[in-house]
Amino acid sequence: MSDLLTDELGQAFQITDEDKGCRIKGQQCILANIGVVRSIATFLSTSLGPTGMDKILQSKDEDIVVTNDGATILKEMEMTENPISRLIVQLSESQDEEIGDGTTSVVVLASALLDQAQALLGQGVHPIKISEGFEVGLGHAVEHLSEISEEISDLKETMMKAAKTSLGSKIVYKSLERFAEICTDAVLMVADMERKDLDFELINIESKVGRDLSSTALIKGIVINKEFSHPQMKKEVKDGRIALLSCPFEPPKLKTKHSLVISNPKEYKELEEYEKKKFAEMIESIKRSGSNIVMCQWGFDDEANSLLMENGLPAVRWVGGHELELLAVHTGGSIVARFEDLEESDLGKARVREESLGTENDKIIVVENEGCSKAVTILVRGANDLVIEEAKRSIRDALCAVRNILTNSRIVYGGGSSEMSCSLALERIATGYSGEEREAILGFGRALEEIPLCLARNSGHDPIGYSSDLRKLQMESKNFHLGVDCLGDGEQDMKKLGVFDALSSKIRQFQMATQLVTMVLKIDNVVSDFHD
């Protein structure tokens, strides 16, 4: 078997016979996989924290993404060659879907745990023993997190602080207060407070290029990136009774394949009269229901458009299916699939207006229901698409952070303070164990210190010296709120700064990192491009 080689990214590979494929096994396989995780963590670690750096990524199609969001970076890197890389991407997607933030921390912590595991492997400790010891360490760390967590007192204020913590490292940090307020208000408007749950589908995020990020607004209603179908239609309907149509505004057609042969002008005239009659019947169905505005999922031709305008019925065509569903929820209306089924009870109630944005006169339709806002829209403004897309990612992360506070009312403080406190606790707890298990628990504690170490490095501090001082400071003061001064203002008390995470989010980060490490340590064979 040939020696283990690494490429420029530190990923392991072997040169083998083409027919036999590539195979790495035993401890060599574990070390190779650890190297893969380490290389990815090294790349991601500079993006951690409020002073983390951005990455610019270019796809094969030459699309450019500028971001410091860990999940987005992993997704856009398109790491498909190495199975461990794909595993990390899948775990990051799971973390992003469940918690919404903390992907970078998960990968950095997993890499630190694997570094500790590599040291133990060098001492002859079996991978399974290391995994079991890490699981014990995880259990004690979770218990300690629960002990140092605090119950929130003011829900909205805590949500605001959670949003600020999430947004502090993002592109929107200069408008931190405004974006935090927008995210908090959006969640409070549509959340089910009795069940302490939130349906993200009720928060629509739309965007328009123009102005700056500070012009981003929360609209108590639905924003549709469309305009009224005719320029002479009314631009505002204050007492809108909205017909939500999923049927096409056109004469009925045979469902089977067919052709229509017209042999003379009379037949053409008859066809024209038939179409006019059908259009008139559709208009009459709408007017009979009491509707004074139409939202249609399909398009319609100029003749139908003219008839709608002549009958004083403002209309919007090509409304997306998701938008139509949101309109139904927000206005209390029902989506109708046939004109003849349209009744007054199906109509939604709301104020509808067309707005012009920017110098290019881009238009949007705003549907507002002040009395009962069951859905909201965050309209993001920005100089270009790159800025807007990163702002939208930042908003989604902040919404998740606020949601986590809603679903779990206990918090732990950030800035690396919780990780350092857990590390100190595990050091004390490990004295009750012996042998390999004790070493694994101590290794778990040392790995947790990688988070404050990384935050200190990204903030311009001497990472090792600063981390040692923080460790000493927590031990002497017994204050587990002390963390890394990322902003350089001399304040290390995260409670005073209002920097925290939901307890559930922090626990999930620890669990995800440990699960990844356990999987890596249990893999002793990697076979790729194998041929019989």
From Swiss-Prot:
Its main location: cytoplasm. NCBIfam families: chap_CCT_epsi, thermosome_beta. GO terms for molecular function: ATP binding; ATP hydrolysis activity; ATP-dependent protein folding chaperone; unfolded protein binding. It comes from Encephalitozoon cuniculi (strain GB-M1) (Microsporidian parasite). Keywords: ATP-binding, Chaperone, Cytoplasm, Nucleotide-binding. Component of the T-complex protein 1 (TCP1) complex. The keyword Thylakoid does not apply. It is found in: Cytoplasm. The gene is CCT5. This is T-complex protein 1 subunit epsilon. The lineage of its organism: Eukaryota, Fungi, Fungi incertae sedis, Microsporidia, Unikaryonidae.
